[in-house]
Amino acid sequence: MSNKEVKAILKNARDAIRNKDYKEVLKQCKAVLKLEKNNYNAWVFIGLAASELEQPDQAQAAYRKAVEIEPDQLLAWQGLGNLYEKVNQKDFKEDLPNVYQKLLELYRSSDKQKWYEICKKLSDLYQQEKNYVPAAHTWHQLIKMKEDESIKSNELYPLWKRMTELLSEDVEKLDNETQELLLNAFESAIPCIEEIPSEEHQMLYQHYITCLSKLPLEEAKLKKVCENMITVYPSLIYPLKVLALHYIKSGDITEEAICCYSKLLELDPLNGPGLIGMGIKALHDRNYVLASENLSKGLKDVNCCPSAWCCLAQAQLKIHKYAEALVSCDQAINGATQDNSAPQSVVQKDAAFRLKAEALVEGNSSNNAEEALKALEQISNADNNPEICAIKGQAYLKKGCIDVASKISEELRLSHEHLAEGHFLEGLLQYIQKNYSAAEISLQYALERKPENAVYHYYLGLNYWFMSKETRRDKTKAVTQFLKAAKMDPFMSRAFYYLGHYYSEVAGDKSRARGCYKKAFELDDSDGEAGAAAVDLSMELGDMDVALAILTSVTERADAGTAKWAWLRRGLFYLRVGQHSKSVSDLHAALRADPKDSNCWECLGEAYLSRGGYTTALKSFMKASELNPDSIYSVYKIASIKQILGTYKEAVNEYQQILMKSGEYVPALKGLGECHLMLAKSALSDFLDLKAVDAIEKAIEFLARAIRLRPDLLCLWKLLGDACTCIYAVTHSSVKVNVLGILLGNDEEQQLLNKPEVLALGGRCYGRALRIQSTANLWCDLGINYYYQSQHLMGYDSLTNDASELLEKSQQCIKKAVMVESGNHQFWNALGVVSCSKGMGNNALAQHAFIKSIHCEQNNVAAWTNLGALYLMNGNIELSHQAFKVAQSLDPLYVRCWIGQALIAETVGSHETMDLFRHTTELSMHVEGAKGYAHWVCTTLQDKNNRNTALYRYNIVQMNAITAAHLALSKYTERIQNDRTAFEMLGYLNEHLNLKKQASESYRRVVSILQEREDKESSNSALQHYGRSLCAVGQYQEAIQTFSSTPLTEFDDLTGIALAFFKKGLLQESMKAYKQALSVAKSDQEKAHILTALAIIEYNRGEFDTAKTLLFKCSVLKEPSIESLQSLCALGLAKRDVTLATAALNELLKHVKIKDNIYERCLITSAIYVLQGRNEAAQRQACRDIHSHPGNPELWAFLSRLVPQHVPRDAKGGAVAGTVAYTLNINHSKKALLYAAVNELSAGALLADDRKKNALNTLQRAAHFFPDNPAVWASLMAACEAENTASYLNKKSNKKTDLSLTFLASVKSKTEGMKAVPASYTQTLRSWSLCQAICALKDQGRISEAEALCTKSIQNCPDQTPFFLLLRQIQCKQLQSQAQISEPVLEELKKTVLSNFTSHNAWHWLAEVYQSLGMMMDAEMCYRKSLQLASQQGNWNGKLSSLLRLALLALKVCMAKIPDSRWPGLLQEATSEVLKMTFCPLAVLLQGILQFSTKGSRKTRQLLEKVVYQSGCSDTIAFVARWYLLRHLHGKNDDQLVEVLLDNAKAHGDTRIIDLHKQLTESS
């Protein structure tokens, strides 16, 4: 095809491009390429079209093809460049710079403007890719092209500026040529700026300087540029700062550098480089403090400057700030490491490591040696530097490696003999090894070479300080060296510290010593020894302000857990000045520093003690004692604090520990005496007199031991007098005190003293104390002691001369006390008491003394009370009442004023008397209050007509008066043992509380007191009470003897001895005494009682008719007694005479009020119903009475007892009744808990059903409360057996298998001690328990043990048929396990069962034997026999059990598919009878299973669902019902009901049904 045709097609392509029809373009170009494969334009057009159609790869290929065809043609390269710019593709971007380079080459000669554009694009592209060097070179080509065009300098400036910007990143990493290019750009740009000075010019200059500062080889140019900029901008900080840093790094300290630093600080006083520079200058000028200060401030601004950090470390070393120097060295090392490229970095690191090593070596911590050695290892060429070797030797020496240090020292001295450091190291070695003479020589050699070295002088002085005895006495040499060291190095704190030692210990100049210590501490505030010495001397010199200032300055700067010495001393200072809270705070801070310092804990304890924090003080001293067990002081303080807190027994133990450790320690002996004295006073306040006497005896013993060691101590004699005097309250017969002979002036070890002798000893002790020092308190104590002595004498004799003399002495002593200290109200009060006492009778003086006491102290309850008592003694009731009233207002808890008001109320006959006396007993125990309250309680109790009044219920019942009065009287009689009326009242109250033995003892004391007084009339009355109480406790012979001691003429005497004869079994003598009493009886009531007693005697003699006649005689009296009618009812019941019992009950009901004798009436009525066979009526009667009297616990207990015996089906209600009885009255709990447990056992309340309410738990409580009741142990045995059976049925582990024999032994031991119970009861209980134990052993498989126990029981009780039955059961079980039971054996078993004709369970057992042999008819006969027997006995449970067993027997036969229609009928009949008695799920289940076996589908589902969905059904019965119901529903394919059943099973946790359903589903 011709060239024209190609051109035509290309023309069409161009038209298509103009029309933007790029597909057409491709079509036309392809047509061209078919004609001409290497057509340049066609490939370019294809590239363009593909680019527009977003086909970049095709476009690139087309352009590349065009470039290959004609590489120097622009069109294709332009297209390729446009494509790469347009499309953001990685390979395109990478190739774009090459395209730009080609375009630059093509445009260079053709189009300058296009060249500039492409050059800018290429530079920008390099900059975007962070290729700054190529970008700069490209940009430099553009600048050259512009320069060739001779453009103006202001037009060139932006170009050069951009050039500097491109190369300013990572200047130090640029090659030399590029660096030169950068510097040339700066130098070319700066002249191009027209306006100078200007901000633009300044910024460019700064940029230039910044770049130069990064080029170490351009330091000269940097210095020149900075100087030029300073010339142009003299007030600008930046060039000065850079120039200063240049001087600092180069170590330049010339005038020029210092001038720079000064100018910089003039412009900015806080400028970092300026401060650093001046700091370096100060360091060279040896102004180390200023250098350290300036360098520290400067480095806060310029952190990364290794040379400055080295200078700072050097300055800090010079002023001995080792910790700060270590930080500075580390900073220098880090900075030099970061600037590793710098030529001086190695030198700086070596210097920093050396300084660090020196700081570690010279520091106080011995743990720094290893770190110092590591630092020295980092120094380059260290082994060739002798000075560094010397430092290494010191480090080894500090580490304790003396051999290594010695080797280094020797090498240094051999190789560098002129070196002072080697000799110094040798001197240190000798000094540490205490070779002081050798050390002196070496140190002097070192000083010869370096005489201005303060450290050498210090160690030489230290060597002299510890050298020989001569130098120890004469410290002149040492102090000379310390003075030189201090002069050469005024920052060496240890030199000043030892100068302080010299002035303090040798020169005796404490003021100058304090100055030296203070200077040492100021130089090194970590030197606690210097600070502590400065503070201690300041306090010693009385300069507390200076001491406090030092301590405060330390504590304010101290971190937590540091500066213990300062906190401790400041804490002690505050403790001394009474600022206890601050003291506690500071001592806590001291303990944070050292928690194991026992002294600190003791100081803290003292601080707490000073501010009244006894508990915290106690803890502190206990901690101190724990840390230092040998400290006597800590234990003593613990004991004394416990004594203060009132825990005297614990304090006694602590004091005893002190005595065990240190022997006879007087403070501990005194403390023991005080504690025992306080224990005695506490016991006296509680009326525990014998305990008080023991405590007083111990107090006297310990105080006497203390006096033996220190007889000069007044406090010991005073305490001993107090101990002897406080025994005044104890009765004479109770006081028998052993006293050391030293107190009595003889050589005997101990001597027994009675009460008057002990009181007299107390008086002598007060006299001895007065001889040591005469004080008012001692005179008063002596007077009180004399008063108590006189009162004791008057208590046993009438007023004697001795008593009068003692009273007179008492008054004179107290008057002496008043004269010495007339403002003491207690002395006036004591004077008043003595003056108005019996034997003195000076009431006027007493009144005056009491009033004076009140004037001395207005809030004086004792004086007001005594004044009231004085007025009451004189019969002035109104004034007495007013005085007591004031006393009550002053202290409402003061019991004596309340007693006074009670006595006034009693005198005037007020109804508040009893309330007042009761209030006194509630406040505290006092003899007057106790006896007064007991008197009013007994008086109220004796009035039997007021028992139903509200006043009685409040005063006696609600206020628990009998118990309160009994307790008060018990304490009263413990102290006052000769008051027969008190003992009479106590006996009366004991009888009310049913404390029979205690009542007997009280009446015996009354008899003994009256016999001593020979009061016949009162003695006869007391003998009556005593005889009655003896009879009550079962001492009948003693009671007969007691009554025989009376004239036996009064009614009470005769009835008392008659009762004693009856209880003794002497019926004839009893009848005789009762008949004699009948002759003296005055009222019909008394006669009725005697006739009733005679009837009881006749009944015991077997004369029933005579007894009945006597009781009938009682009933015809005008006022028949209730007791006689009750006895007549009981006689009718005993003889099973319903008519007699009913008639007597009707007569009884006529004479008994509704609220009286509720329990007895209910008991008799219910017994009659039971006798008539009306058991439910008996239950209803008990329920009716409970409904009428719900608060009567006896009725609830009776109902609980009645239910299991006569209506066992209501056992759950019986259990509730027993629980209520127990809750209402604890006195009935002994029986009520047992009744409740028996009911629970009868109701089947097991542990598995309820963990709280079950028979086992209830019986365990009963056994815990009443272990003496054998019935409880027998019932507990039954409960355990029931639990074992339930565990066996539920396939659970059994934990109570081996307890039956233990319980049996308990029953036997408890019944042996029961005398008041009929023998028949104990025999029955034992037999029942034996049977239960034998059954338990049999069930557990312990057959041989069961057989042996049964055989033994038969031998002991051959008439007990149950044992024979049990033996046959055991033998039968053995036979069944071995062979078939023969016919003769069955006959023998039947005979045994017939011998137990009252036991339906025996027939049950025989039926089971027949069943095991397949003899179903015989088994049926046995069940019918048991059913008949249970029906005859009215045994509801037995009847129910027999019917269910009969039904189960019938079901077994039916399930065996035996063709006999009688058995299904028998099952239906038996279960129907059961359901007539009660709703029984088991009976319904048996009917349902029968229907299931006979395929009665509808009836089966109804019956089984009735059991499954019935609430309250047992788990076992419900499971069996679900099992059969699931099989039935599955057979009927009733999926809906099956799902309902499965949900029910899941709700009740019946997993077995779920498993059965799976098996049935899989099998179908």
UniProtKB/Swiss-Prot annotation:
Q: Supply the InterPro entries for this chain.
A: Ski3/TTC37, TPR-like_helical_dom_sf, TPR_rpt
Q: Which Pfam families match?
A: TPR_16, TPR_17, TPR_8
Pinpoint the residue ranges of every TPR repeat in the record.
Answer: 6-39, 40-73, 75-110, 116-149, 237-271, 306-339, 420-453, 456-492, 493-527, 564-597, 598-631, 633-665, 678-713, 743-776, 861-894, 980-1013, 1020-1050, 1051-1084, 1400-1433
The answer to whether the entry has keyword Repeat is: yes
Write out the entry's keywords from A to Z.
Answer: Repeat, TPR repeat
Q: Which Gene Ontology BP annotations are present? A: nuclear-transcribed mRNA catabolic process
SMART domains linked: TPR
Q: Which domain of life is it from?
A: Eukaryota
Extract one GO cellular component term from the record. cytoplasm
Q: What is this protein called?
A: Tetratricopeptide repeat protein 37
UniProt source species: Xenopus laevis (African clawed frog)
Source organism phylogeny: Eukaryota, Metazoa, Chordata, Craniata, Vertebrata
Q: Which gene encodes it?
A: ttc37
